[in-house]
Amino acid sequence: MSLASVAARRASSLRASTLVRTTFNRAIASASAGDALETVVGVEIHVRLQTRSKLFSGSASAYGGEPNSRVAPFDASLPGTLPVLNAGAVALAVKLGIALEGEVQLRSAFDRKHYWYADLPHGYQITQKRSPIVLGGVVRCQGNLSGDDAGDERSTDGALKVGIERVQLEMDTGKSSVAEDGRGTLVDLNRAGQALVEIVSEPDMRSGEEAVACVEALQRMLRYLHVSDANMEEGSLRCDVNVSVRTSEERARGVFGERVEIKNLNSLRSIARAVKYEAQRHAKVLAGGGKIERETRSFDVNTGKTVVLRTKENLLDYKFTPEPDLPSLVLTSADVEAIAGRMPELPNAAYERLVSGGASPSASNTIVAFPSTLKYFDVAMENCGAAKSADVANFIANEIIGAARKDAGATHKEPLSTLPRAASARRVGELLGKVADGTLSGRMAKQVLEALMNSDERALGDIVDDICGGGQISSDDHLRDICHSVVRDKPEEVRLLQGGKSKLMGALVGEVMKRTSGRANPKDVSKLLADIVAGEP
């Protein structure tokens, strides 16, 4: 090779290097000049399936228990043991794929993902890297997204859609913990081999809030399908997030920044905090002329910061290989159609049903959060007489679910799980029917509800008689007489009211309510008083 050609290649290399630096510097300058960086988020969610036994063994699959009390020989990787696929887990994965509007694969396969931890006795995890059971799909997030870190075009119409790349079956690992004396690691294999699905999203979210909305939507779907209880606090749903940032120029060109993975976020609040912190960290690094490195990080809930677990140089090489002890998983179209024919109403459909029936978006959102709360609403509606759907929804969302959550001290569990039998949906429906027909006022209904929440199981009529004196005064003549007496006893207030001091009407209504022990309907009282003050009999 001649010196001339070497010089030419050297010059070409320098030009390319200069171009890279220039492009990078433009991106930094753009960010520094006020061109806001866009946050890009994807999620990887591991969901424990509600199966009686584990994915590849007959050992019981349940949360908790004495350490190592639910371990089959295969779970402990004893020599000579082989995996036997749980058909129930397959059916749940198919059901989830249908709900996500994904493409259920009639032929999928299992792989070995090799790595070593003390709680992984096989030295590999059985998963579906090459050929997952579901490809594609979408999560439709209900509700209004708003806040400081909401995406621009996604924060007003509640129409966030997050694409799903894949859903794959895999087995869970055991659980490691540090011994009390700090001298060793304890391993509990109760969780080892439990059936999981991993749900991998597209990078379609633009904030921590949108990531939370996606996970919440998935939680609801999983619960309605009875695929999982999806309780993050018990590890039934574990979330990893991938975070990157990019300039408007990069967005226009359809390219993404270097991503960082944050592992094992175990609450919705942690997801939002971790994404927000990591996006800010990226922006700070880039503004200082640095470069984002691909790495895996964890989130410290105490400091609100992410911490490096593994750098790019130390990322694991899992050496995926086909699972030799399991044949391909083959389904038929009839299998998939049979499962599709048994699909329940999903939360988004339930939400639309409630809103179209007149319930507010806020109350509807609260009610459809759990299948049990939706069922409670439906049973109450069947027993509420002429009560409007909107009134029933608001009462249940605010007075019952709200009170139950306050008593439980948590919002992540089913709020009605500890509701007393006295406050059944049927009895609450009948109570609201009495409000609709004028027997009770809204205030009276709340007083009766308090008795029900305190496990008062007497007949509803007896409770109404005891607490509300039988309900609102139903005789117009009796109520008119009381209003006349108030007008006679308050001549100065009446004179001022007739002179235009309209606020005094409230004082007169209050006096009538006092004389009736709260049993009068304030609207009826106000109308009667207005007629009397105007000179009508």
UniProtKB/Swiss-Prot annotation:
Protein name: Glutamyl-tRNA(Gln) amidotransferase subunit B, chloroplastic/mitochondrial
Catalytic reactions of this protein: L-glutamyl-tRNA(Gln) + L-glutamine + ATP + H2O = L-glutaminyl-tRNA(Gln) + L-glutamate + ADP + phosphate + H(+)
Family in the record: Belongs to the GatB/GatE family. GatB subfamily.
PROSITE patterns documented for this protein: GATB
EC number(s) on file: 6.3.5.-
Recorded superkingdom: Eukaryota
Assembly description: Subunit of the heterotrimeric GatCAB amidotransferase (AdT) complex, composed of A, B and C subunits.
GO biological process: glutaminyl-tRNAGln biosynthesis via transamidation; mitochondrial translation
Further details from the record: This protein may be expected to contain an N-terminal transit peptide but none has been predicted.
